[in-house]
Amino acid sequence: MLLLWPLLFLQVSALRRTLFDRPKQLMQEGRVRLVGVIPSSGRVEVYHDGQWGTVCDDGWDLAEAQVVCRQLGFPGAVSVATGGQYGEGSGRVWLDDMNCKGSESLLSECSFKGWGVSDCTHKEDAGVICAPGKNTTSIRQMSVDNSLGLSDDLGLLFDSEDGCDFTIAVRDLSEEAELTFCVHRVILMIYPELNLTHDTRNITVDISQTCHTHVPRFLRYLYTRQIDVSTTSAQCLHQLAFIFGVQKLMEDVGRVFTALIPEDNTFQTQVSMYEYGVRTGDLVLQENVLQYLSWNCEFLISSPVWSTVSFDMMDALLQRSDLIVKDEAVLLEALERWIQDKGDQISSDKQVSLLNHIRFLLIPVDKLYDIQFSSSALRQSNEKLYLTGLLRGFQFNALPFSKIRDQVVKLSGNYIPRIYIGDEWSLGLNVSTVNNPHYNPYQYGYDQRYGQSNRIEKYLSTPAHPSAVYRGQMIQWQAQVFRSVQDCRNSGISCNSVPLVRFLATSSQYSYSSTIRYNNRLVLTCKNQNNVFHVQDFKNNMAVIPTNSSMGLPNPCPDDYSFRFVVRPQYI
């Protein structure tokens, strides 16, 4: 994939598998139901992949409730219910981080992470209260749905070309290759991006010859809305969907791209993917790549690919708070090196724009002191900006937040921490050490002890906040990994799945609760590949490690990864 991504397209044959083998599943796919005492309110459940599952209440609001209630035939929604108010469901948490406009016909048409991609438990199952009224799903009516057969019939219509009245020519000018297809104009009229007029009888599509073998399957999708997508066919299908303006297929194929993201440790594939996402306007693909590169920024900035990153990509990266680096000073040094490598390609205005994304307030105070005497070309050409950043950084470190609150808030997100993994603010746990009898529990300089079997514990002391005001005020943190249900029980914890991790302060955290909050993070990294593939927050000091199928990115090292616990203090 590394070499072929810049070429954009692959000549492959995809595995064909008909979804009609499971008619019962397809007939119910995406349906919702309410589980409660009365028909108009209850826990929301959605049907997918042959089973009912729940919806997480993260992002759950009235717009999402309106879609559910209308899908069930009620006039609208009265209110939402969160926190498992209607009891805890069972099975998978199918949907998380829902984002509906409120006008969708089906809940599954809204934006969400992906089927089964969630870090929620059933304690966060969402519910709704619908307005009572006419319910079109009442037993007084009978719904007849033969849409499954319609899709099959339309597929046969495409195959036969009976009555076709529209010609699509597919060509590659560089190879002088061309294919011709006869289709039905009425089908193409469904896709307004083609801008067909009443007199249009043919169109020509220019695309690489390596994609020509996928064109028939794509055109058949326009009839049936069904297609099998593999990692090797995804690029061509995505490009065709972009040309024809089939946004839904672009988003679905983008999820296949997500599976490719962790496969290249050189980052060349990811950078090419992002630029492709920009060209095709695929915001989902852009976000997935940026998230992965943010998580792996520590490795990215030390790779040869760093100097090839575009200005737009750099600008997008530097604005993110999920960016993982040792500290903010390391990021500034990497930016200075990138600008130096780019030379005259980066104008002075662009330099200023990028430097404004550096969070000088969060640079460790000892490194702020060193930056004063830096002789870098970027520093010399942007002296005023550096001095302003240094002044604000020293003020942030020397003064109580109550004194500088109004000024700091004006700086937007510049006082919000990224994920800083320096030794002062994070600790690592290697899961393989649990079963290693030769492991020295003091090798990192922390007190560590083992539970009866698979539990491992480790301690970290940090200042209450990075500001110099709090340097002498320490908080001790305890990190625990429970690898069996029995270990959870031994510690008085209920866990439905393992591994389960806990990260909590054992002293004095709450004395700062009116000034500081802790948005701590758990980072999972492949030990041998230097590959961060999952980041999540803690809920009530706990984090359930999701299965591979429910992660936003696939786990490339399911049996060989390490945990890193990161403390992230932030002024309130």
Swiss-Prot record:
Domain (BTB) ranges: 164-231
BACK domain ranges (all copies): 270-372
Signal peptide: 1-14
Pfam family, one: BACK
Protein name listed in UniProt: Galectin-3-binding protein B
GO BP field: cell adhesion
Subcellular location: Secreted; Secreted, Extracellular space, Extracellular matrix
Glycosylation sites: 135, 195, 202, 430, 548
Origin superkingdom: Eukaryota
One of the record's GO cellular component terms: membrane
Keywords: Cell adhesion, Disulfide bond, Extracellular matrix, Glycoprotein, Secreted, Signal
CDD domains per record: BACK_LGALS3BP
Main function: Promotes integrin-mediated cell adhesion.
Cysteine disulfide partners in this protein: 56-120, 69-130, 100-110
Ranges for domain SRCR: 32-131
